[in-house]
Swiss-Prot record:
Sample GO molecular function, one term: phosphoribosylaminoimidazolesuccinocarboxamide synthase activity
Keyword Transferase set for record: no
Domain of life: Bacteria
Family: Belongs to the SAICAR synthetase family.
Cross-referenced PROSITE patterns: SAICAR_SYNTHETASE_1, SAICAR_SYNTHETASE_2
Pathway: Purine metabolism; IMP biosynthesis via de novo pathway; 5-amino-1-(5-phospho-D-ribosyl)imidazole-4-carboxamide from 5-amino-1-(5-phospho-D-ribosyl)imidazole-4-carboxylate: step 1/2
Entries under Pfam families matching the protein: SAICAR_synt
Organism: Corynebacterium glutamicum (strain ATCC 13032 / DSM 20300 / JCM 1318 / BCRC 11384 / CCUG 27702 / LMG 3730 / NBRC 12168 / NCIMB 10025 / NRRL B-2784 / 534)
Catalytic activity: 5-amino-1-(5-phospho-D-ribosyl)imidazole-4-carboxylate + L-aspartate + ATP = (2S)-2-[5-amino-1-(5-phospho-beta-D-ribosyl)imidazole-4-carboxamido]succinate + ADP + phosphate + 2 H(+)
Protein name as catalogued: Phosphoribosylaminoimidazole-succinocarboxamide synthase
Length: 297
């Protein structure tokens, strides 16, 4: 359900977030408890998910040395009380039309493409890689942004260059890989593998490239436990892969290619997903989720 914030104009709704206008230079980005999978927004919500996404984004925005769109603290007085802990005050940006995916390990759609072409988004990879193999170096595999219900489309770096120009495309790729490497080191030091992640960037009024949207959350990233990691099989995860696995497993009775809406998630899957999200935040940030604004009632 969308928060009714009478003091602000509602601008747009995404799969998970609601965007409100504060003034001509700032927006309020509110993370809901909605969860999406296979381009569907599920009917079932995950309690506290929006708070985890906001807390995780805040942690990495504060930690990673790169310009970002945050324009106030987590308890900024411009944040209405009813969404405190799940909202951020952000600068308005001219968002770039690409999802900036960085992969350090081979899994998901990247693995499917590799099996067909020995490459991912035009990046040639060595022979003999298997599910969950670590790549020799992280690779930049951009995708076009899709509307709700549509699929993001993986594209080559040449497409980004054609759209944005060589200089901006190189800046986007280099920034994405550098941020991934910094975050992967933080996660690994805490016993977590950052397998891949997705960034979104925009341009501010000064022409500066700025990191926007959410960053390095369990929604936008694949996080695996370092302990027990071994290439060749699907890894346990701290992200919404658990939901995807249930939906495509025998217990759901759902075919993702049927065109039908997914079923409601059972309580056990909801709670297990909530626990995984919270565990990811606590492991990586070193902070207790209960200490995050509005999380203990």
């Amino acid at each position: 359900m969308r928060p009714e914030l009478s003091q602000y104009k509602h601008l747009s709704a995404g799969k998970v977030r609601e965007i409100y206008e504060i003034d001509d230079k700032h927006i309020l980005m509110v993370a809901s408890d909605r969860i999406s999978a296979y381009d569907f927004i599920l009917d079932t919500e995950i309690p506290d998910k929006g708070r985890v996404l906001t807390a995780m984004s805040q942690f990495f925005f504060d930690t990673i040395d790169f310009p970002n769109h945050l324009a106030g603290p987590a308890d900024d007085p411009r944040i209405p009380e009813e969404v405190l802990g799940r909202a951020m005050v952000c600068k308005k940006l001219n968002m770039l039309p690409f999802e900036c995916v960085v992969r350090g390990y081979l899994t998901g759609s990247g693995l499917v493409e590799y099996k067909q072409t020995s490459s991912v988004c035009g990046v040639e990879l060595p022979e003999g890689l298997v599910e969950s193999s670590q790549l020799p170096e992280p690779i930049f595999t951009p995708a076009t942004k899709a509307d709700i219900g549509d699929h993001d489309i993986n594209v080559s770096f040449d497409v980004v260059e054609e759209r944005l120009g060589e200089a901006r495309a190189n800046q986007l790729r280099d920034a994405s890989i550098a941020i991934y490497k910094a975050a992967a080191e933080i996660a690994r030091d805490r016993g977590v593998i950052l397998a891949d992640t997705k960034f979104e960037f925009g341009i501010d009024e000064d022409g500066t490239l700025v990191l926007g949207d959410e960053v390095l959350t369990p929604d936008s990233s694949r996080y695996w436990p370092l302990e027990g990691y071994e290439a060749g099989s699907v890894q346990p995860s701290f992200d919404k892969q658990f939901v995807r696995n249930w939906l495509t497993g025998p217990k759901s009775g759902w075919d993702k290619d049927s065109g039908l809406e997914p079923p409601a998630l059972p309580g056990s899957v909801v709670e297990a997903t909530r626990e995984r999200y919270i565990e990811a935040y606590e492991l990586i940030s070193g902070q207790k989720f209960c200490q995050w604004i509005g999380s203990c009632v």
